[in-house]
Amino acid sequence: MKHLTEMVRRHKEGKTNGIYAVCSAHPLVLEAAIRYACANQTPLLIEATSNQVDQFGGYTGMTPADFRGFVCQLAESLNFPQDALILGGDHLGPNRWQNLPAAQAMANADDLIKSYVAAGFKKIHLDCSMSCQDDPVPLTDDIVAERAARLAKVAEETCREHFGEADLVYVIGTEVPVPGGAHETLSELAVTTPDAARATLEAHRHAFEKQGLSAIWPRIIALVVQPGVEFDHTNVIDYQPVKATALSQMVENYETLIFEAHSTDYQTPQSLRQLVIDHFAILKVGPALTFALREALFSLAAIEEELVPAKACSGLRQVLENVMLDRPEYWQSHYHGDGNARRLARGYSYSDRVRYYWPDSQIDDAFAHLVRNLADSPIPLPLISQYLPLQYVKVRSGELQPTPRELIINHIQDILAQYRTACEGQ
């Protein structure tokens, strides 16, 4: 995967560059990302998680082949070159099947890897850190590494079988806490120690050797670690470089390896840039992008209420609230407190559990209704200034068309711009 190996090579030469990974399956987020990469003539890394997309459909209802088809079709419609599009699989392993015995969970994980690789995903994050039903808690580094090596062997064989060569790149290791933001209120976070990072690497190197996979070690481009960044419902733990100095220096001893940082959402632009400088050069972003989508939609809904008679309004916010109350499975175990606290969290939490509800047909209908209502006549500039002030500046300068769709896309791209700036390097 030349874009990624080249990025790592340049970073190791001191260019302080990186790449961001868009972790979302929402069509508007993906359109915003593709159009932004197209305009800036940069490669684009889009990742699916094992929760979103698997051989059985995941929570999006898409298999890896479906997801690839969906993204590639969108890219083609936006004239984005296919060879600049990189697809990655995140947290691939027994994650979805922790309630099953390890043998069964790992058999499913084998099939998961096959389905991702056969579909053309080239960046594979092997994560076998989670305990299954009959496993000790926590797992030892050796068991985690043995399982990852088993999956790497499946990946290599599948890639050669389907594409005639093995050109995958791998990411190993995992962060704490769980993917997708912390469940509980945070105050401070433990940074991965250099010793723990070295132990993970050595366990994986040994396990890969046992599987006859020593030759692929240069294609293991990144180790997932915790540099001390996280968010919960209303707080962000900002990157503190001094706490990660030893970890940052440790990776300089490895010729072909950088770090991958998860949960970088909501970090300041300065923190994002410093993360890349400190070798956390793959920045994952997901909830912050759907959070920006939600912000734009709530703003447009407020504009709609000013312009359209109540009986003709989409009622998007109320429809969203009703659906979330009818189907609480995606937020109930995450949001705590009294009724008002949970109501606020459903709408505004940084963890953005609302992202799981956008595909719902009732919500999608309300969204379409909102866009129709606001597309009928130009949105008054003072209302754009009131509710989308960053976009207002661009509308006034002639950079941006004040249509509902363009306002949404541009608001999401404001977040992407922070990541691009952080990753540009010298």
UniProtKB/Swiss-Prot annotation:
InterPro entries: Aldolase_TIM, GatZ/KbaZ-like, GatZ_KbaZ_carbometab, TagBP_ald_KbaZ
Annotated SUPFAM superfamilies: Aldolase
Pathway: Carbohydrate metabolism; D-tagatose 6-phosphate degradation; D-glyceraldehyde 3-phosphate and glycerone phosphate from D-tagatose 6-phosphate: step 2/2
Family membership: Belongs to the GatZ/KbaZ family. KbaZ subfamily.
Function: Component of the tagatose-1,6-bisphosphate aldolase KbaYZ that is required for full activity and stability of the Y subunit. Could have a chaperone-like function for the proper and stable folding of KbaY. When expressed alone, KbaZ does not show any aldolase activity.
Coiled-coil region: none
GO biological process, one term: carbohydrate metabolic process
Oligomeric form and interacting partners: Forms a complex with KbaY.
Protein name: D-tagatose-1,6-bisphosphate aldolase subunit KbaZ
One Gene Ontology cellular component annotation held by this UniProt entry: plasma membrane
